[in-house]
Amino acid sequence: MNPRRKSRLSVVLFIFLGISVASALVLYALRQNIDLFYTPTEVVNGKNNESHTKPSIGQRIRIGGMVVEGTVERDPKSLKVRFDLNDIGPSVTVIYEGILPDLFREGQGIVAQGVLIEPTVLNATEVLAKHDENYVPPELEAQMQKIHKPMGISDLKNESDRDRQEKQFKEGNQ
């Protein structure tokens, strides 16, 4: 091989090596910021019911579902809240310490981001309340109501029974 080809080959190899190292460092840095989205059923059973796709304990994930009515437990001495999330299958318990969004209530859809500390317990660092701003076709809404009513989840557009009871109690005391 002549010297000119050797120098070209070494330059190409050096560039390839540099790009490989840079890519590896970027992927390593992003690894801690990538949060995979799961539903409660996928956390318990794995995606597509494959157990090897379950998130591992200690993994950062985002989980979205409906807050199960009657499961919200607030610590009176701190901002710690514990509640269950589910979709159409098993529930996952979420533990969160902080101020919850104004739209958070039982029967409401939320997304929680945090670390899985047990197979069905998420220690959340952030809780986002989902709200309905889009049109839902009547047939889809009817189908959702069929699924959510048997699970004890209230009407998605109206206030929950607990909210109504609290409102009646406040009105009765005035």
UniProtKB/Swiss-Prot annotation:
The keyword Metal-binding applies. It is found in: Cell inner membrane. Residues 1-8 are cytoplasmic. Residues 156-174 have a biased composition (Basic and acidic residues). It comes from the Bacteria. Keywords: Cell inner membrane, Cell membrane, Cytochrome c-type biogenesis, Heme, Iron, Membrane, Metal-binding, Signal-anchor, Transmembrane, Transmembrane helix. InterPro entries: CcmE, CcmE-like_sf, NA-bd_OB-fold. GO terms for cellular component: plasma membrane. One of its GO terms (molecular function) is metal ion binding. Pfam families: CcmE (PF03100). Residues 149-174 are annotated as: Disordered. Residues 30-174 are periplasmic. One of its GO terms (biological process) is cytochrome complex assembly. Heme binds at H131, Y135. Belongs to the CcmE/CycJ family. Heme chaperone required for the biogenesis of c-type cytochromes. Transiently binds heme delivered by CcmC and transfers the heme to apo-cytochromes in a process facilitated by CcmF and CcmH. This is Cytochrome c-type biogenesis protein CcmE.
